[in-house]
UniProtKB/Swiss-Prot annotation:
Residues 393-402 have a biased composition (Basic residues). The modification Phosphoserine is found at S290, S295, S365. GO terms for cellular component: cytoplasm; cytosol; cytosolic large ribosomal subunit; nuclear body; nucleolus; postsynapse; presynapse; ribonucleoprotein complex. Component of the large ribosomal subunit. May bind IPO9 with low affinity. Interacts with RBM3. The lineage of its organism: Eukaryota, Metazoa, Chordata, Craniata, Vertebrata. Pfam families: Ribos_L4_asso_C, Ribosomal_L4. Residues 364-419 are annotated as: Disordered. This is Large ribosomal subunit protein uL4. The gene is Rpl4. Belongs to the universal ribosomal protein uL4 family. Citrullinated by PADI4. The modification Phosphothreonine is found at T266. The modification N-acetylalanine is found at A2. One of its GO terms (biological process) is cytoplasmic translation. Residues 364-379, 404-419 have a biased composition (Basic and acidic residues).
Length: 419
């Protein structure tokens, strides 16, 4: 939005356009790098920390000595003496009640972080560029639905305000009071132990007022909740991107807005108020890739497109896939049908033969006359349905074994010799 409109309207204290226009500073077209903003914010935020440490004597203000081995107890130092519960209890160790912590904290920790100056300036440029895009500002939670324009620039007369009621009236005329009402609605008690440490209440962030000279503007705006006041010569990334997230709603005075080109320069001219500083440039000046690829310079270097398309055909087994077989051999369908019909015809013939044989056998068995003595017996039938003669018929059951005739023993009379 800001990049498409090079002129910015200046609004009066009544919330109407004053008729004056300001050229959009080049810093609002700088690349937006959330990664750099977050990195710089994280490191600069660490510089506000206050060193802390536990007492060097904590956990060691008792007399204790290890009992050594052979007592069937741990070798941790134990309090000496007797007559009290404390005697014999473990001491000093971090696993003991009343002992010191593991690796007691020291005040000589590396609390501060150094950040490159150019990197800090890059982060501020990114935060300023993001503050001119309504989508990013609204995604941060600012209520700017009725704000006439972004970036929002007002006349320098605002820098001379000394009363809060004048500041409130200005915000209402600029339709920015909805953002303050959001702050009022968000005021609540902090969760956690910060309540005990003089950080009881928390609230959302409101607009950031950026001015050039303080002629009373600080006193006018400082009592409105959520408002942050910044001098354009001392912009702070911690205020322009709270939490390391770009998209703060900023209200500029005219003189502060015009001073941005001198502070950060343009791509044609270096910054006059900073030594050896040039505005960061985009890695791609034109992000329309389709336009770049279709440009004659690129097309001239490319080879001609290959019109012929080679598609890989999935090979299927025609013996298993009928559709593929019919593609290769259309007569296969007729052959398969003829085979099925032939099999059905053969099956019918086989069934008829079996029925005829069974009928013939039944008629034969009815014509046979039974012999004498064999009226009660059923005719013996062979394997193929033929009758067996009585002579050839084998007796059923166990085989009869022929026994030898028993020899007679000679009597006593026979034993006597003849006289």
């Amino acid at each position: 939005m800001a990049c498409a409109r090079p002129l910015i309207s200046v609004y009066s204290e009544k919330g109407e356009s004053s008729g004056k226009n300001v050229t959009l500073p080049a810093v609002f077209k700088a690349p937006i790098r959330p990664d750099i903003v977050n990195f710089v914010h994280t490191n600069l935020r660490k510089n506000n920390r206050q060193p802390y440490a536990v007492s060097e004597l904590a956990g060691h203000q008792t007399s204790a000595e290890s009992w050594g081995t052979g007592r069937a107890v741990a070798r941790i130092p134990r309090v000496r003496g007797g007559g009290t519960h404390r005697s014999g209890q473990g001491a000093f160790g971090n696993m003991c009640r009343g002992g010191r912590m593991f690796a007691p904290t020291k005040t000589w920790r590396r609390w501060h972080r150094r950040v490159n100056t150019t990197q800090k300036r890059y982060a501020i440029c990114s935060a300023l560029a993001a503050s001119a895009l309504p989508a990013l500002v609204m995604s941060k939670g600012h209520r700017i639905e009725e704000v006439p324009e972004l970036p929002l620039v007002v006349e320098d007369k605002v820098e001379g305000y000394k009363k809060t009621k004048e500041a409130v009236q200005l915000l209402k005329k600029l339709k920015a009071w909805n953002d303050i009402k959001k702050v009022y609605a968000s005021q609540r008690m902090r969760a956690g132990k910060g309540k005990m440490r003089n950080r009881r209440r928390i609230q959302r962030r409101g607009p950031c007022i950026i001015y050039n000279e303080d002629n009373g503007i600080i006193k006018a705006f400082r009592n409105i909740p959520g408002i942050t006041l910044l001098n354009v010569s001392k912009l702070n990334i911690l205020k322009l991107a709270p939490g390391g997230h770009v998209g703060r709603f900023c209200i500029w005075t005219e003189s502060a807005f015009r001073k941005l080109d001198e502070l950060y320069g343009t791509w044609r001219k270096a910054a006059s108020l900073k030594s050896n500083y040039n505005l960061p440039m985009h890695k791609m000046m034109n992000t329309d890739l389709s336009r770049i690829l279709k440009s004659p310079e690129i097309q001239r270097a490319l080879r001609a497109p290959r019109k012929k398309i080679h598609r890989r055909v999935l090979k299927k087994n025609p013996l298993k896939n009928l559709r593929i077989m019919l593609k290769l051999n259309p007569y296969a369908k007729t052959m398969r049908r003829n085979t099925i019909l032939r099999q059905a015809r053969n099956h019918k013939l086989r069934v008829k033969k079996l029925e005829a044989a069974a009928t013939a056998l039944a008629t034969k068995s009815e014509k046979v006359v039974p012999e004498k003595g064999t009226a009660d017996k059923k005719p013996a039938v062979g394997k193929k349905g033929k009758k067996v003669d009585a002579k050839k018929q084998k007796p059923a059951g166990k085989k009869v074994v022929a026994k030898k005739p028993a020899e007679k023993k000679p009597t006593t009379e026979e034993k006597k010799p003849a006289a």
